[in-house]
Amino acid sequence: MDASTINSLFLIGALLVGASILVSSLSSRLGIPILVIILAVGMLAGVDGGGIIFNNYPTAYLVGNLALAVILLDGGLRTRVASFRVALWPALSLATVGVMITTALTGLVAAWLFDLSLIQGLLIGAIVGSTDAAAVFSLLGGKGLNERVTATLEIESGSNDPMAVFLTVTLIDMIASGQTGLHWSLLGHLLREFGIGGLLGLGGGWLMLQLVNRINLAGGLYPILVIAGGLAVFSLTNALHGSGFLAVYLCGLVLGNKPIRSRHGILHMLDGMAWLAQIGMFLVLGLLVTPHDLLPIALPALGLALWMILIARPLSVVAALLPFKAFHGREKAFISWVGLRGAVPIILAVFPLMAGLPDAQLFFNLAFFIVLVSLLVQGTSLPWMAKLLKVTVPPDPAPISRSALEVHITSEWELFVYRLGAEKWCIGAALRELKMPEGTRIAALFRGEQLLHPSGSTVLEVGDMLCVIGHEHNLPALGKLFSQAPQRGLDLRFFGDFVLEGDAELGAVAALYGLKLDGLDAKMPLAQFIRQKVGGAPVVGDQVEWHGTIWTVATMDGNKIQKVGVRFPEGTRPGPGLFL
């Protein structure tokens, strides 16, 4: 390869990445997921478009694995362990039982539609059996979903790859060796994948945490060290026949939930690297496919995709979540719909090609077609389905920027910046009138380009920018303090007519609103009653019905319900005798 060829590759790569970024701005306007647009750019530049011929499957496998490792590391860093209280076991059930059921149901129909053997059909089911972390993390961000749904989908997508990889590799070996039956030893291999992946992921994350916090480096080197460490954990786990995907996700989880030096620098760079990984991966996968090869299989492939989306995924979700009573029908329906397929199935479809199996090209084309349908149908309709199934909650207003104040190696102090618009309720109020959360301080106030020295008598005006020092756990309270009037109206419509304290006694609430206790303990706190009615760990937005009234969890403090909203039937007035 001469210098001219290398330069041409650089130019083509830069143009494709740049075009993907520029065209992605159409995503919000057209309502199409960014990943579909990037995939389309790759396809248009490929053999049936721009004429770029790319059929190097080992290179695609390399790029895909590298990209997924970075994406999962970033996803783990941003996942809060607190979300495990509501989603860990349901997500693991989906990642194991759910994947197996989806594989079986999809495989049976694939074998029938394409006249394949049962083992070949199951291989197709295994290839497309897992949801994709890149697609889930990308499309769920900023949608305002309740914590139970978001955490379940994110943990599932980060942990279901071991099952899909295990089933795919096992079925490929069976086809290559002519086996037709399953053996109990396969269960041991599966447990090894999860066990080694879990141990090395948690252990590697702990070692990386100690290293980052004990060594003095230039600020820009910490993110690179974390990425290098994550890739080392990923590759070492794969070398020991564990799940590298699970390991790198858990490594990020450990790093993201402990005090770590240069946290914001690490997160900021990982965000950019994760985007670059997604762009590069989907461009390569778009280049890899030959669009005209998809046309002959379009109708049966569409039928298989719809079967998986409308039948196989919902049945697997219902079965996997059957033991977990806290999930409402609406939440199960939404989780069923967000079985997003992305890069993982396409990468797994490369395995049969590299193994030289018969019909391997058909498997690859089918996987690509199903991913395309999943992203277009499920990804595009995600916001609409979230509203239809009522799994969203009003988001807390966020600061326009936040940055770390590294006064200590493990300091968690941050600087939050809020801009006061005309609709802010605190306009015209003096600073002393603001009930700031305990432990927070207003550090500066900007008016136009002028820096003011804030005092208790300083009156806030439209356009003022407040710089507040606090911790991450202060954000909900600060968000309420600097909330907008329209947002408060939305909160009232969502949470109900009144908001009560969670520690209010049930007897007092019943007397106030004229409700019958029906043998319930009058001393029981309202929060405890709601928790019992939910049937599991509650989250903001959970709703229960009692005597025709709707009770909604409004705020949480860890596992504790702080406030509960109550909505009365239309046309009624709350008060004694209402339900007597």
From Swiss-Prot:
Residue intervals of the RCK C-terminal domain: 402-484
Pfam family for this entry, one: CorC_HlyC
Keyword annotations of the record: Antiport, Cell inner membrane, Cell membrane, Ion transport, Membrane, Potassium, Potassium transport, Transmembrane, Transmembrane helix, Transport
Record bears the keyword Iron-sulfur: no
Cellular-component GO terms for this entry: plasma membrane
Top-rank lineage group of the source organism: Bacteria
TM region(s), chain numbering: 6-26, 34-54, 57-77, 86-106, 108-128, 162-182, 193-213, 217-237, 240-260, 269-289, 292-312, 334-354, 362-382
Catalytic activity reported: K(+)(in) + H(+)(out) = K(+)(out) + H(+)(in)
GO terms for biological process, alphabetical: cell volume homeostasis
Signal peptide positions (record): none
Main location group: membrane
Protein family membership: Belongs to the monovalent cation:proton antiporter 1 (CPA1) transporter (TC 2.A.36) family. NhaP2 subfamily.
Physiological role: K(+)/H(+) antiporter that extrudes potassium in exchange for external protons and maintains the internal concentration of potassium under toxic levels.
Name of this protein: K(+)/H(+) antiporter NhaP2
Primary gene name: nhaP2
